[in-house]
Design a protein with these regions (language model features):
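Hinge/lid segment of periplasmic solute-binding proteins
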Residues: 37-53, 66-68, 106-108, 133-192, ...
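Short, solvent-exposed loop/beta-turn-alpha elements that line the ligand-binding surface or hinge
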Residues: 152-160, 215, 241-243, 266-288, ...
Length: 489
């Protein structure tokens, strides 16, 4: 009897193992679509075609935080972003056989370096990474390939590791000469935002501006009303100054007037169905946004911007915005990178971060914009001899950036280390980066249009219509020269 039971138990055990084996085989066939180990960059597959190759990048802004970490980490430092970048580069070499090298050039000399290299026949880099306006100027001189019409390209610019809204903003007549996304970090670092002083919010019994954001009520009117409540003469001399004890509602540089207008979703240009820009400053909504921002920025009892007190390059110009770091301003318009700066690191204030306010509550979404001088993008040289390899390497860098670098930069470092003591800022950052506008006109800077609003605010005359009337012919002339160059073939 015991023998019979043992035999039955063995048979049951064998049957169970067989069924489990069948189930395991079914799981593999249904869920594992790859044969053998998955490629390091899955959509690029496995290949030995690039063994021994080197992707050489000419880049600027070496001194900026997270510039070198994008491509050039050379050793483990126990800094999460650097180490993720270093390990990524090692994995790319192990799996695909290519290396990445970076040549650094000062941002102020970058364009001259590129022009001089071409004139001298120097051809020792494939890709350029620099500020957006620098790349746009070089694109207009014919230095780059159109990414939208590349043959043998491995770029998948419609994928989430590339910034599709940026591509749409930056294309002109269907041509795209630079792209950005998870391949770099200085695009996020030089995205604009507003900081606010939590103590002044509480001292003045004001509603949380973060809650206004959640409620879709963070508007220019809301900012202005709160700024007016908070601002006051504080040192007894009877006048508002930027070097005493007065408290301001808003501090900023004059350029930030345009930031507030762009927050209203009103770039200088709009584009037609053929992807051709046209000057839009006199469109009804743009005019209304300008008038509202004009009211805020010219209220000298509430708002202090740099050019009201100093020239932009004066040694003491920093004193205007320093009021925020001293706890003497409710709001401060700035770029994300400022939270790593010495001033805010050492400031004895509690602050939070906000998107740029909307024009009104009818606006569909919050909009923010960029600093076109340091916001980084990537271009391929027009005489690139190996488009297949260069685009493969850039695509691999972008995908691995999203998978391995961005989580360390955005989630672990920006949200959890650099923005401290704040329950809302992580979600505010998500809102800020969800809808970013890059105005193509100020990147190509036709007729120095980046200064249009600055000129009006610095003059103090509110002359929007007169400026447009005096400048639109030159603006159109310079824009059309660019269009002719881009479409001449």
């Amino acid at each position: 009897m015991k023998k019979t039971i043992c035999i039955l138990l063995v048979l049951v055990s064998l049957l169970t193992m067989a069924l489990a084996s069948c189930n395991d085989a079914s799981d593999v066939s249904e869920n594992d679509v790859s044969v053998g180990p998955q490629a390091y960059v899955p959509h690029l597959g496995e290949t030995t075609a690039y063994q021994g190759k080197v992707l050489t990048i000419l880049s600027s802004h070496e001194e900026h935080n997270y510039s070198k970490e994008a491509f050039s980490a050379t050793e483990v430092t126990n800094e999460p972003i650097n180490d993720a970048s270093y390990n990524r580069n090692i994995k790319l070499e192990e799996n695909y056989g290519f290396k990445i090298e970076t040549i650094w050039e000062d941002a102020g000399n970058f364009m001259n370096r590129v022009r001089d290299d071409k004139a001298a026949g120097i051809d020792n880099y494939d890709v350029m990474v620099s500020g957006l306006q620098t790349l746009a100027f070089l694109a207009a001189e014919g230095f780059f390939l159109d990414l939208n019409s590349l043959e043998d390209s491995n770029l998948q610019l419609d994928q989430p590791w590339w910034d599709q809204p940026f591509n749409e903003d930056m294309s002109v007549a269907g041509k795209l000469y630079f792209a950005t996304g998870d391949i770099v970090m200085l695009d996020d670092e030089y995205t604009r935002c507003i900081l606010y002083n939590k103590d002044l919010i509480e001292d003045n019994n004001l509603e949380s501006p973060a809650q206004l954001v959640y409620d879709h009520k963070w508007t220019l009117d809301a900012l202005y009303e709160m700024a007016r409540v908070a601002s006051h003469e504080g040192d007894g001399d009877g006048k508002m100054t930027v070097t005493g004890g007065d408290v301001w509602g808003l501090v900023q540089a004059s350029f930030e007037s345009y930031t507030l207008i762009l927050g209203s979703d009103c770039p200088l240009v709009s584009k037609d169905e053929d992807d051709i820009p046209r000057l839009a400053m006199m469109d009804a909504r743009n005019v209304e946004a300008f008038e509202k921002v004009w009211e805020i920025c010219t209220d000298r009892e509430t708002t202090a911007y740099t050019e009201q007190w100093y020239s932009w390059n004066a040694p003491d110009a920093y004193k205007v915005c320093e009021n925020f770091q001293k706890g003497q301003s409710l709001f401060y318009t700035i770029t994300i990178n400022a939270v790593s700066g010495k001033g805010l690191r050492e400031a004895d204030i509690r602050y939070g971060i906000l998107p740029i306010p909307m024009y009104d509550e009818e606006q569909e979404a919050y909009c923010t914009t960029i600093n076109p001088y340091q916001f980084h993008a990537v271009s391929i040289k027009e005489n690139c001899k190996d488009v297949d390899f260069v685009t493969f390497a850039l695509e691999a860098l972008a995908w691995t950036g999203k998978e391995y670098i961005t989580p360390e930069y955005y989630e672990r470092t920006l949200k959890n280390k650099r923005i401290l003591d704040d329950d809302d800022s992580a979600e505010m950052l998500d809102i800020i980066f969800s809808n970013r506008i890059a105005d193509v006109s100020i990147c190509y800077n036709w007729d120095d249009c980046i200064q249009y609003y600055n000129r009006i605010f610095s003059a103090g005359d509110g002359g929007l219509a007169s400026l447009v009337e005096s400048e639109q012919d030159q603006f159109n002339f310079e824009m059309e020269k660019t269009l002719e160059f881009f479409t001449k073939d």
